[in-house]
Amino acid sequence: MNFEFGAKRRDPYAWLEQSLATIHRADWYRSVQPINGRPGATVVLAGQEVINFASNDYLGLAGDKRLMAAATAAIAEFGTGSTGSRLLSGHRELHRELEKAIASTKQTEDALVFSSGYLANLGAITALVGKRDLILSDQYNHSSLKNGAILSGAAVVEYPHCDVAVLKTQLSQQRQNYRRCLILTDTVFSMDGDLCPLPALFDLADEFSCMLLVDEAHATGVLGKTGAGCVEYFGCTGKQLIQIGTLSKALGSLGGYVAGSSALIDFLRNRAPSWIYTTGLSPADTAAALAAIKIVQQEPQHLAQLWRNIHYLKTLLQQLPNLKLLPSESPILCFQLPNATDALKAGKQLRDAGIFAPAIRPPTVPTSRIRISVMATHKVAHIEKLVAALKDVI
């Protein structure tokens, strides 16, 4: 291909408008709308009060006064920013308190807090594998897992969603050609709501001498008897693996973590670039997350209420035979629509009815859908209003 320069120079930014036009034609265009006030089961969105079924604040803790008080107290004592990398001036004892609390919750030897869950995935994956290694990744994994795999320089092979048989075949054919192998999976898939086949993945990791990294972002605080996550839910606590998660969903704050063996965490402190070369998590976010973990541990009623709401909604949705509901074992419930145009129309109809459950479209997902996120703070009336609105949409 020949590109002409010199006297016939073209605007090097012109392609941006052309690309945006293509996005508009495909009904893939996205924009942001302001939400006012505290987070909760109802919010004011662009001036309209709506019932919020789009939030990942599963336990309703982001608006809890105790988290806000903890954040305020941390600001008063430590200031607004951590002021540097944790290896320089950015480390506070508060960070270690949070890491110990995470390790206690996950029943691991140690944990390491990152500035976001996305950065935790990037840092861990790029530190653990490189050019002589192999990554096997579920095709529906989160963007942070996929991008971490690419950045690592390892050979990356995707396996069909939750297909253990194909994964085993891939390992049989390729594992012997690489130094190290890392299996990557979300535990709760954020755009579907289903769970990974964790026990079977453990079996394959053992059989083929692979490391196993699981992203518990949508499972932490939500699954398992104590809310420790999918690892607890499947009875796999104590098994050797790498657990990654976020502090910004059920825990109502901001940040991410890696939990595992002492050797793993010590290694990441020395080799994870997205931890080493960034400012430490702010005191306010750290304190809020620590307060949230204490609430989850001491007040199981929030988790119990979340699951009562999930079961009630599922029972009501069974009365809608035309609803193409995807399999789910989490607070995330999705129903498919034929195309992006229909999904946008359904999202608008719900919004007009006072329900915020926006359309999810390609390229985020392979097929367009409406995604519903259940919270512990939803009332029975909120759930019933959602189902009544869906009857008019479907």
From Swiss-Prot:
One of its GO terms (molecular function) is 8-amino-7-oxononanoate synthase activity. Homodimer. Pathway: Cofactor biosynthesis; biotin biosynthesis. Keywords: Biotin biosynthesis, Pyridoxal phosphate, Transferase. Its EC number is 2.3.1.47. Catalyzes the decarboxylative condensation of pimeloyl-[acyl-carrier protein] and L-alanine to produce 8-amino-7-oxononanoate (AON), [acyl-carrier protein], and carbon dioxide. The modification N6-(pyridoxal phosphate)lysine is found at residue 249. Its cofactor is pyridoxal 5'-phosphate. Belongs to the class-II pyridoxal-phosphate-dependent aminotransferase family. BioF subfamily. This is Putative 8-amino-7-oxononanoate synthase. Pyridoxal 5'-phosphate binds at residues 117-118, 190, 215-218, 246-249. It catalyses: 6-carboxyhexanoyl-[ACP] + L-alanine + H(+) = (8S)-8-amino-7-oxononanoate + holo-[ACP] + CO2. GO terms for biological process: biotin biosynthetic process. Substrate binds at residues 30, 142, 364. The keyword Oxidoreductase does not apply. It comes from Nostoc punctiforme (strain ATCC 29133 / PCC 73102). The gene is bioF.
